Regions:
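Helix-to-loop junction immediately C-terminal to a conserved catalytic motif
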Residues: 62
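Conserved ABC ATPase signature
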Residues: 152-157, 161
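Short catalytic/signature loops enriched in Gly
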Residues: 2-4, 17-22, 27, 147, ...
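P-loop NTP-binding/switch modules centered on Walker-like glycine-rich loops
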Residues: 187, 191-269
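A short, proline-enriched helix->beta-strand linker immediately N-terminal to the Walker B motif
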Residues: 172-176
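Conserved ABC transporter NBD signature motif
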Residues: 70-78
């Protein structure tokens, strides 16, 4: 098992504000007591509905936002105590690829200037001084010959080409960690596959580590080694992609999997869709107990009052759900006596058929 590059313990982020004339104050708990690690050389996917806190975690990991509580370590060093030149030096090892390449690239600057700027900031001089590195980065992401791109502006390229440029910019400082915040959601399906293939190739060639944020489970299956599922500021399940897709142990994870479309008509009619009732509660006023209990199809009386703790159900597979606690449910799965693992409810025990057909074994 690879050592952890990023370690997060008890991470919490609360945003505060006030209404007109400061008469009414409000707080939003975007991230609540989150703990996980990202291992060297792996891709950890962070999935969940919009507003669940995925992008907030990305900004916290990169120190673009200060945490309210908790601890973030990069390569064993706490980020909280870093500032000034020390933080600047550490940021060379952490870069980000944003969702919309058109919004993240300066429309007034040439591609050569955009790619050379990170080197100019960290090494000094002007972006034009680093033409050799710029050419190498463009070639690395498949934009060849580089001379055809250096003097052009972002609007002259397609969406896929712009995202390749954004990836090249993230690679200029040769980082160890890349945070990819929905990097393919703004692209069409064919271009999306090309960008994912590029990112996998770069990871193999350069030894990159990805924190990959997405809402698309098909993308998770394609690129990730492990996946963490978030709901309303908390991680409800985390583990290997194969393990979670084959046997989800949290009702929310199962609902997400069941919502994925099935292109094969031979199996789509047998697909059990789990319909979640109600809306996602407001993070300004989260439910007591388990935050998912108002929408859970397998809710228990205890769920509304006691927050579940994450239990390890298999090596590296953790889920925070009372249904996995034998002391509460009182029945064990057949053949699992003494393991502490209980049989999931029948409504969400089996994986959707689409995830078993045509599996990919590209990663361990």
């Amino acid at each position: 098992m690879n050592a952890a590059l990023v370690s997060i313990e008890g991470l919490t982020k609360v945003y505060e504000g006030s209404g007109l004339f400061g008469r009414r104050r409000w707080t939003v708990q975007a991230v609540s007591d989150v703990s996980f690690e990202v291992r060297r050389g792996e891709t950890l996917a962070l999935v969940g509905e919009s507003g669940c806190g995925k992008s907030s975690i990305a900004r916290l990991v990169l120190r673009l936002t200060e945490p309210t509580a908790g601890r973030i370590c990069f390569a064993g060093e706490p980020l909280a105590g870093m500032s000034g030149p020390r933080l600047k030096a550490q940021r060379r090892h952490m870069q980000i690829v944003f969702q919309d390449p058109m919004a993240s690239l300066n429309p007034r600057k040439t591609i050569g200037h955009i790619l050379g700027q990170p080197l100019a900031v960290h090494r000094g001089g002007r972006p034009a001084h680093y033409l050799d590195e710029i050419r190498q980065a463009l070639a690395l992401v498949g934009l060849t010959p580089p001379e055809q791109f250096i003097q052009r502006l972002p609007h002259e390229f397609s969406g896929g080409q712009r995202q390749r440029i954004a990836i090249a910019r993230a690679l200029m400082l040769r980082p160890e960690l890349i945070v990819a915040d929905e990097p393919v959601s703004a692209l069409d399906v064919s271009i999306r596959a090309q960008i994912l293939a590029l990112m996998k190739r770069l990871q193999g060639e350069l030894g990159l580590t990805y924190l990959f944020i997405t809402h698309d489970l098909g993308v998770v299956r394609s690129i990730a080694h492990r996946v963490a599922v978030m709901y309303l500021g908390k991680i409800v399940e985390i583990g290997d992609v194969a393990s979670i897709f084959a046997a989800p142990r949290h009702p929310y994870t199962a609902a997400l999997l069941s919502a994925s479309p099935i292109p094969d008509p031979e199996v789509s009619w047998r697909h059990r869709r789990i319909i979640l009732k109600g809306d996602v509660p407001s993070p300004a006023n989260p439910p007591s107990g388990c935050r998912f209990h108002p929408r859970c199809p397998a809710v228990l009386p205890i769920c509304g009052t006691v927050a579940p703790v994450a239990r390890e159900l298999a090596p590296g597979h953790l889920a925070a759900c009372h249904l996995n606690d034998p002391a509460i449910v009182g029945e064990r799965a057949p053949g699992m006596a003494g393991t502490g693992v209980v049989e999931p409810p029948r409504a969400w025990r089996d994986p959707p058929p689409s995830f078993e057909k045509g599996r990919s074994d590209d990663h361990p």
